[in-house]
């Protein structure tokens, strides 16, 4: 961009014919023409930089916005919802004056280019979203997807991602309490690195991203601004990959968790002293986003002097300063008489802080550099009035053939020995095997409030030490189900996360989501996206769990090959007393095992069809959300009233996977009996939704059965906790030692 003379607003007005590199910055021709129309002149280089990042797919949701509106239009009535979609993160009331904020986001593309930094800064960004709401971060979760487990590139990407998440989270002193690790060839070259965080605050501590009050000062504080991450939102997060790994590296941000830790403490102290009017973290699009968002959400305008921004690299141009995505930075709006105290607190925590501007009583965002005005825009046009596309979408030609290729017709084991061999193969397959080698690199118990963490059904954190009030969070997604039917697949992800919260004894309250899809320019991908959003919105309405916010990640494809549609759903729940939680592990010999829900012949998209036959086809399991709700109520009541000592949801891998996990975690075996009307194969491997297996003390058997009967939930006694093997009567016996070897050796063997 031209540096001589400075491309001021005055210069831009006088030189209408100057060609600007709008295409290189990711804008389409008609989008550039719209900018010219809004301004009534050509943009300056700095204005072009701002519009290009803020109108990118990543920041503006221009392809997804028309569909995402359903989350608001179909939102269920919820007394718990305090802050919804549109802020940095959603906030829900969890009782006793406490509020919890939570959100899931993606850092997919940066994590492929630079796995460690991409994943680390993903954690840093989501944690700053939580701080910006006024909350103290208390935990993180990380739903991850990688290519085939035995592919050489997985061995490059996965260890870096895991080290980045662990390194950053551990340095912040935040326990990692949940997430998933899934392998599938469709994620080759497009790993999904989704990160979530939870924060806790009192109701009166909620803060919003708005700049109001003419004369109030705008303070930039945190790390210095450097050249890392420039154009990250427009370059990395809004494009597909085509053999351009090294050249994309400068667009990956570099994280410093110790700086972030200071930023957290500094910000929370400023909040405690009521010094902050409005606040915004600097994430995607950096200062371009923070200034335009704060100004457009407030009641006035803003004037900013870029010369006052503390730089790590003095050669940066004003355009680069506006686009930089350097990490660990925040922007606060502070009343003039409180500025000195705010700066004192920053100094105490060794955090660099500078007044870079002020709120004005107009409606313009004006930015100056070396005395010249280089930006003069209506901030709403930058932050909120970007292009909105109704992209064409169509059910793909191949969908019918895929659904007709019925997994229920695949060859099944013909003998007990074959059945036994397939059980061992399933529990030792990469997706069903223990992920302990990965999760042990994270600290689960720092801060001392972790109640449950991986491999439990959901992570659980104590919020109040005296009362035992706690929250649980589960994240789930199944790209295989969604590929077969995106509407049902999204609802199955929601149902599983809802169920995973309920099995621990917590009541599901609200949802955040991370929607990972291929290119929106492909009508088939756009159809998958539209169907998944419709399914999720309908499902949340039916379950009474509003969507509080989330993230869309598009362009997850290499060349023509898109990832499976992968909606990842996080459900947050509340429990009155964490002492009443229910774990996955079997607790005592002699306890009775009950299967809740109906088991049908449903193998489409199943772990069995993938592991044994390398097959994907047919229809995913049917979803009945009213039944899920009923199951949830019964699990919560049984947990609260001491009727069950362990509970585990049934999902990938079916009943046998759930029983093996509970047995290995508790070090206690199980003797199972195939119920009447089912064959052993369907009993063990079906992935019918809406089911859980629970261990009931004999003293509670009558009370538990009476409750299930009164509420109309099918319940079947299937066995007993006993011994040191998993035995299916009349079929096979598998010692826990053999199961442990199969279950726990796979991931270290592939990755260590």
Curated annotation (Swiss-Prot):
Quote the subcellular location field of this record. Answer: Cytoplasm
**Catalytic residues as annotated in Swiss-Prot or TrEMBL:** 58, 107
Q: Which GO terms describe its cellular component?
A: cytoplasm
**Source organism phylogeny:** Bacteria, Bacillati, Actinomycetota, Actinomycetes, Kitasatosporales
Molecular functions (GO terms): ATP binding; magnesium ion binding; phosphoribosylformylglycinamidine synthase activity
Question: So what family is this one in?
Answer: Belongs to the FGAMS family.
Which residues does the record give as Mg(2+) 1 binding sites? Answer: 105, 551
Which top-level group of life is the source organism from? Answer: Bacteria
Enzyme Commission numbers on file:
6.3.5.3
Q: What is this protein called?
A: Phosphoribosylformylglycinamidine synthase subunit PurL
Q: Which NCBIfam families match?
A: FGAM_synth_II, PRK01213.1
Keywords from UniProt, A to Z, are: ATP-binding, Cytoplasm, Ligase, Magnesium, Metal-binding, Nucleotide-binding, Purine biosynthesis
Pfam families from the UniProt entry: AIRS, AIRS_C, FGAR-AT_linker
């Amino acid at each position: 961009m031209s540096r001589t003379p400075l491309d001021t607003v005055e210069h831009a007005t006088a030189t209408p014919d100057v060609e600007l590199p709008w295409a290189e910055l990711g804008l389409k021709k008609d989008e550039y023409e719209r900018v010219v129309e809004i301004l009534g002149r050509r943009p300056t280089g700095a204005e072009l930089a701002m519009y290009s990042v803020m109108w990118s797919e990543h920041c503006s949701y221009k392809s997804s916005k028309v569909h995402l509106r359903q989350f608001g239009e179909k939102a269920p009535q919820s007394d718990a919802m305090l802050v919804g979609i549109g802020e940095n993160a959603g906030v829900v009331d969890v009782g006793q004056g406490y509020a919890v904020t939570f959100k899931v986001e993606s850092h997919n593309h940066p994590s492929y280019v630079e796995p460690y930094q991409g994943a680390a800064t993903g954690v840093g960004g989501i944690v700053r979203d939580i701080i910006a709401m006024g909350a103290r971060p208390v935990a993180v979760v990380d739903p991850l997807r990688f290519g085939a487990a035995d592919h050489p590139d997985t061995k490059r990407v996965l260890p870096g991602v895991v080290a980045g998440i662990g390194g950053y989270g551990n340095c912040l002193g935040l326990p990692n309490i949940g997430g998933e690790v899934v392998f599938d060839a469709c994620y080759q070259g497009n790993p999904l690195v989704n990160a979530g965080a939870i924060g806790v605050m009192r109701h009166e501590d909620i803060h919003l991203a708005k700049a109001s009050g003419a004369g109030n000062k705008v303070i930039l504080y945190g790390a210095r601004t450097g050249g890392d991450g420039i154009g990250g939102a427009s370059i990395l997060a809004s494009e597909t990959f085509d053999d351009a790994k090294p050249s994309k590296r400068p667009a990956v941000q570099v994280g410093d968790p110790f700086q972030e830790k200071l930023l957290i403490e500094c910000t929370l102290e400023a909040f405690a002293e009521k010094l902050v009017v409005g606040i915004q973290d600097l994430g995607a699009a950096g200062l371009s986003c923070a200034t335009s968002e704060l100004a457009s959400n407030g009641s006035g305008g803003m004037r900013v002097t870029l010369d006052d921004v503390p730089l790590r690299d003095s050669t940066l141009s004003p355009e680069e300063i506006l686009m930089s995505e350097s990490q660990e930075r925040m922007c606060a709006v502070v009343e003039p008489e409180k500025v000195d105290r705010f700066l004192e607190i920053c100094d105490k925590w060794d955090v660099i802080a500078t007044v870079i501007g002020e709120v004005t009583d107009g409606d313009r965002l004006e930015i100056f550099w070396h005395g010249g005005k280089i930006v003069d825009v209506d901030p709403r046009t930058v932050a909120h009035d970007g292009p909105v596309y109704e992209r064409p979408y169509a059910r793909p030609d191949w969908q019918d053939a895929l659904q007709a290729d019925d997994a229920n017709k695949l060859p099944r084991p013909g003998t007990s020995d074959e059945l036994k061999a397939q059980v061992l193969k399933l529990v030792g397959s990469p997706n069903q095997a223990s992920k302990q080698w990965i999760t042990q690199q994270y600290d689960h118990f720092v801060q001392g409030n972790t109640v449950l963490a991986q491999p439990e059904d959901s992570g659980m954190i104590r919020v109040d030490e005296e009362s035992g009030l706690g929250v649980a969070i589960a994240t789930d997604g199944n790209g295989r189900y969604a590929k077969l039917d995106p509407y049902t697949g999204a609802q199955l992800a929601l149902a599983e996360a809802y169920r995973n919260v309920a099995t621990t004894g917590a009541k599901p309250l609200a949802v955040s989501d991370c929607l990972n899809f291929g290119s929106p320019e492909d009508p088939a991908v756009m159809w998958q996206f539209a169907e998944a959003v419709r399914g999720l919105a309908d499902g949340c309405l039916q379950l009474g769990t509003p969507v509080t916010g989330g993230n869309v990640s598009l362009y997850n494809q290499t060349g023509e090959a898109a990832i499976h549609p992968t909606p990842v759903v996080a459900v947050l729940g509340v429990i009155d007393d964490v002492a009443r939680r229910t774990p996955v592990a079997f607790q005592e010999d002699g306890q009775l095992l009950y299967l809740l829900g109906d088991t049908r012949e449903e193998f489409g998209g199943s772990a069995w069809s993938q592991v044994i036959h390398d097959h994907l086809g047919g229809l995913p399991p049917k979803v009945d959300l009213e039944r899920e709700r009923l199951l949830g109520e019964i699990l919560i009541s049984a947990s609260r009233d001491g009727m069950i000592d362990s509970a585990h949801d049934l999902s990938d891998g079916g009943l046998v996977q759930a029983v093996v996990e509970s047995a290995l975690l508790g070090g206690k075996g199980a003797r199972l009996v195939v119920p009447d009307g089912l064959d052993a194969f369907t009993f063990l491997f079906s992935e019918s939704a809406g089911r859980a297996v629970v261990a009931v003390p004999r003293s509670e058997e009558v009370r538990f059965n009476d409750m299930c009967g009164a509420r109309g939930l099918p319940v079947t006694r299937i066995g007993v906790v006993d011994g040191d093997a998993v035995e299916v009567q009349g079929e096979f016996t598998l010692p826990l030692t053999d199961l442990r070897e199969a279950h726990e050796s796979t991931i270290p063997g592939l990755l260590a």
